[in-house]
């Protein structure tokens, strides 16, 4: 008879996991020391301490060689935290975001920069731009558009009056959750959220919480704060808000439309280098005459450049003068992109490149 291979015992497998964990810890510290050494070289050569294009290259390389079973999405989250912690050993990134803490903007910032950046909530989109422009923060994060509500016009307006660049984009699925102190649906007598949050969950609330008063809060995070102080109140907010205010999740993903996401922009004083999967945003103004917009956009068609978004806004300088915002696939370091932009400039009153930055093809779900 052939000997059957003996299945390892639970204790044996756990011992092996402990050994692997010890090896991982040693390698993490070895990697951290490498990061410290790199920081020293950067200081000596007066190089910028944060290289987002390098971080993107690290994640892309690992994703390309990952054979599983560990999923790439989880791997990227872990390595994002490793890079965030390593960078903090040198100097924590300072990131301004439209506050308060616990909002979806805060969640998007953490997803992009990791848990070890220093996050600074501010009260307005303008304050985010100011914090970066005056050197108080390395980066800022602002909402630019929602799949249901459309473009955030004020963010576009801010680019008209500053020289900051777009350094990245972050796509975040807006997942609304019903939260309370007890986690018991039967105890809820009132529900708080931002008006937009209440509107996006109205169908679920009518079907599952009929007759329960719906009360406005200035933000989803403020709603969570109120619920944390009221045993009979619930909040509609993010899971990050639940963690911040020690609330339990009664029901996840209660929004009526499941395909609801917000695109955020990371702003900085300069854009990153080319990664190979990039997007470029420009802003321009044209003469008010028939066919003017067609003439401006024609060089993009001629060179086969894919325009992914076009928005227009009143310039607020002269009546009936409009500013156009255009996103396209590619980087200004690409000859095709730079050449087309130079041709476009000839038919514009002015044109500004807002930045070239990595495409975020992921849709974070939280």
Question: Which residue ranges define each predicted feature?
Answer:
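Domain-level signature for soluble enzymes in the chorismate/prephenate branch of the shikimate pathway
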Residues: 1-366
């Amino acid at each position: 008879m052939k000997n059957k291979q003996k299945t390892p015992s639970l204790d044996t497998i756990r011992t092996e996991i402990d050994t692997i964990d010890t090896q991982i810890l040693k390698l993490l510290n070895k990697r951290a020391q490498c990061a410290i050494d790199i920081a020293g070289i950067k200081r000596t050569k007066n190089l910028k301490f944060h290289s987002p294009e390098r971080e993107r290259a690290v994640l892309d390389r690992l994703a390309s060689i990952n054979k599983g079973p560990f999923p790439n999405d989880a791997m990227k989250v872990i390595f994002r935290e490793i890079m965030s912690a390593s960078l903090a050993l040198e100097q924590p990134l300072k990131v301004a975001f439209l506050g308060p803490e616990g909002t979806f903007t805060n969640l998007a910032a953490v997803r992009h920069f990791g848990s070890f950046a220093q996050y600074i909530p501010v009260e307005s989109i303008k304050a985010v731009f100011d914090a970066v422009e005056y050197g108080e923060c390395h980066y800022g994060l602002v909402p630019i558009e929602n799949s249901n509500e459309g473009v955030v016009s004020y963010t576009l307006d801010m680019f008209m009056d500053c020289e900051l660049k777009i350094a990245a984009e972050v796509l975040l699925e807006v997942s609304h959750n019903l939260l309370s102190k007890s986690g018991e649906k039967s105890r809820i007598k009132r529900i708080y959220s931002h008006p937009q949050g209440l509107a996006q969950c109205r169908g679920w609330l009518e079907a599952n919480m009929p007759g329960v008063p719906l009360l406005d809060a200035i933000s989803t995070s403020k709603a969570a704060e109120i619920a944390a102080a009221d045993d009979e109140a619930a909040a509609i907010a993010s899971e990050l808000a639940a963690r911040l205010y020690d609330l339990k999740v009664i029901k996840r993903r209660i929004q009526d439309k499941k395909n609801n996401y917000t695109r955020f922009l990371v702003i900085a004083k300069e854009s990153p280098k080319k990664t190979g999967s990039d997007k470029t945003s420009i802003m321009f103004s044209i003469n008010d005459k028939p066919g003017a917009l067609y003439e401006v956009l024609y060089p993009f068609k001629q060179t086969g450049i894919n325009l992914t978004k076009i928005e227009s806004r009143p310039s607020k300088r002269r009546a009936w003068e409009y500013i156009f915002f255009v996103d396209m696939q590619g980087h200004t370091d690409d000859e095709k992109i730079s050449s087309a932009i130079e041709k476009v400039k000839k038919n514009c009153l002015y044109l500004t490149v807002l930045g070239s930055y990595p495409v975020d093809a992921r849709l974070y779900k939280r």
